[in-house]
Amino acid sequence: MGEKKFKHVMIDTETLGRTPGSVVRSVAAVEFDPQTGETGRKKVWKIDLADSIRYGFKVESSTLKWWMMQSEEARRDFVEGAETPLVDFLDDLDDFLSCVNEENDFTLWCLQLDFDVPMLRSYYAWYNLNAHGCDEEVLPWNFRKVRDVRPYMDALDSAGLLPPKVTDRHTPLADCLAQINYVHLVEKNNLVVR
């Protein structure tokens, strides 16, 4: 029997700003099944900070201050560890997502539609223009199949089923796994999402 094929991927980013064009420091992507909560491949990248700044991505002082006020463990996770060059990260994420489905026929999830996806779009816009000389938007996901976890959290909260946050580490992998759990709990309990 072959490896299970997943049709859903959760992504999460940790950044040094709240607007597109800000530095994306780390990204996680996790395949999952909303019905069962089962996860598949997981991948985490820590993007080379110097690359991001050299290529014109910005650091917002308010976000930098916010990171300085987080726990020592969260700050350490944010700063330490092997870094992936920016172009290698974009190629790797593209490969990860194309392994889900080469025709982009999968659902991409994130916590807020106006945060993670626009942050990554700005990186892909830079990449398409500077690495490929292409000013068209070429993304490794289908923009029609991007979903937001926030309404699922609202449905859980309304039903009194929203689990307490179990960590304050602010790592993209921990956030992805928590967000997958929210989606699964909504499916498991047949809650209405608005």
Predicted regions and their residues:
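Basic/polar N-terminal segments that are highly enriched at the extreme N-terminus
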Residues: M1-K4, R194
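Conserved non-catalytic scaffold segment of RNase H-like nuclease domains
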Residues: E3-V9, E14-C110
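Acidic active-site catalytic centers that drive phospho-/nucleotidyl reactions
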Residues: D12-E14, D116, D148, D175
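Metal-dependent nucleotidyl/phosphoryl-transfer cores and adjacent nucleic-acid-binding surfaces
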Residues: E14, V23-V24, V30, S122, ...
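Residue-level signal for well-ordered alpha-helical scaffold segments within enzymatic catalytic domains
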Residues: D92-D95, C99, P118, S122, ...
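Acidic, Mg2+-coordinating catalytic module of metal-dependent nucleases/exonucleases
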Residues: T107-L113, P118-M119, S158-R194
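Substrate-recognition/cap helix-loop segment adjacent to the acidic, metal-dependent catalytic center
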Residues: D114-P140
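Short, flexible loop segments at boundaries between secondary-structure elements
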Residues: D135-G160
